[in-house]
From Swiss-Prot:
Function according to Swiss-Prot or TrEMBL: Beta-type chain found in early embryos.
Descriptive protein name: Hemoglobin subunit epsilon-1
Originating gene: HBE1
GO cellular component terms attached to this protein's record: blood microparticle; haptoglobin-hemoglobin complex; hemoglobin complex
An annotated Gene Ontology molecular function: organic acid binding
Tissues expressing this chain: Red blood cells.
One Pfam entry name: Globin
Assembly and interaction partners: Heterotetramer of two epsilon chains and two alpha chains.
Family annotation (CDD domains): Hb-beta-like
Gene3D superfamilies to which the protein is assigned, alphabetical: Globins (1.10.490.10)
Family, similarity comment: Belongs to the globin family.
InterPro entries recorded: Globin, Globin-like_sf, Globin/Proto, Hemoglobin_b, Hemoglobin_oxygen_transport
Keywords of the record: Heme, Iron, Metal-binding, Oxygen transport, Transport
């Protein structure tokens, strides 16, 4: 279980209120698919994923990225119970989709990069540390069903 300090919670929620979920979500999933191309196999139904520009412009990638980042909003509402907040998604990704749990960690790191590029100086080392802790906690919660 991940424990967040009051300062970490404030850093996470303070930044989250400024995140454009649609834009950042699409960019995060798109980057995951470009940087780690083997993850594309989970998205066969998304159509053209043949190049970075095709991926970044793909409406299905953008829509699913928004959905993924929206789930982080649920995590932020449940910082004290990430495992419970992601129980159903963990089951889906393990039992039905058979996603390698390492991909959750990769996506989390990409999300941190996206936030850093979007927020620049506002994304201080303390904010980054809090978000890194969050994405790690989410990755662990999503991988829970695998254990």
């Amino acid at each position: 279980m991940v424990h967040f300090t009051a300062e970490e919670k404030a850093a996470i929620t303070g930044l989250w209120g400024k995140v454009n979920v649609e834009e950042a979500g699409g960019e995060a999933l798109g980057r995951l698919l470009v940087v780690y191309p083997w993850t594309q196999r989970f998205f066969d139904s998304f159509g053209n994923l043949s190049s970075a520009s095709a991926i970044m412009g793909n409406p299905k990638v953008k829509a699913h990225g928004k959905k993924v980042l929206t789930s982080f909003g649920e995590a932020i509402k449940n910082l004290d119970n990430l495992k419970g907040a992601f129980a159903k998604l963990s089951e889906l990704h393990c039992d039905k989709l058979h996603v390698d749990p390492e991909n959750f960690r990769l996506l989390g790191n990409v999300i941190v990069i996206i936030l850093a590029t979007h927020f620049g100086r506002e994304f201080t080392p303390d904010v980054q540390a809090a978000w890194q802790k969050l994405v790690s906690g989410v990755a662990t919660a999503l991988a829970h069903k695998y254990h």
